[in-house]
Amino acid sequence: MKHIVITGTSRGIGFELAQQFANEGHKVLALSRNTKPLEKINHKNITTIAVDLSNNDDLNKVTLFIKKEWKTVDVLINNAGKLVNKPFTDLTTADFEEVYKVNVFAVAELTKLLIPFFKKGSHVVTVSSMGGVQGSMKFPGLAAYSSAKGAVITLSELLAEEYKEQQIAFNILAL
């Protein structure tokens, strides 16, 4: 049995992963602003916490839970994402900040907060995007989103190098 933290669990990939891991017998901490979809399932292996990832005070709820209930984290899946679709010339600094708060800063902050709970063999998977690899040329209107997804690719590569001696793995899934 693993202890798995997943962000962005109200729908889509995060919602499905939470159920799949729980059904396989793993303990899942499901983080989302909207916890109702997973609460309806009422799975004994899923704990939900309402978290706004762009709010550091909310992130502290996660560490408090882990300290009290789990003591360790085997897997972190950074799945939550924020997308603003506008032509580049229409994007504001506030648009970029909004996207980066969820897609980059929250990934970095949550990962940093959970590092003390990782052990040899722990794994961090961050969901990126092909837009982060190929850029906005193939994804017009997604300059803020794609550049943020590119940033977490680089961040994950750097963390993989920094934590290789502790045998904590960092990977990206670009969809």
Protein language model annotation of sequence segments:
Residues 74, 153, 163-175:
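Conserved Rossmann-fold SDR core element
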Residues 87-88, 95-97:
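Substrate-binding pocket helix/loop in short-chain dehydrogenase/reductase
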Residues 79-84:
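Conserved NAD(P)H cofactor-binding loop of Rossmann-fold oxidoreductase domains
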Residues 116, 161-162:
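Alpha-helical segment proximal to the catalytic Tyr-Lys
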Residues 129:
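Residue(s) in the substrate-gating loop at a strand-loop-helix junction
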Residues 10-11:
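Conserved glycine-rich cofactor-binding loop
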Residues 111, 145-148, 156:
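Active-site helix of classical SDR
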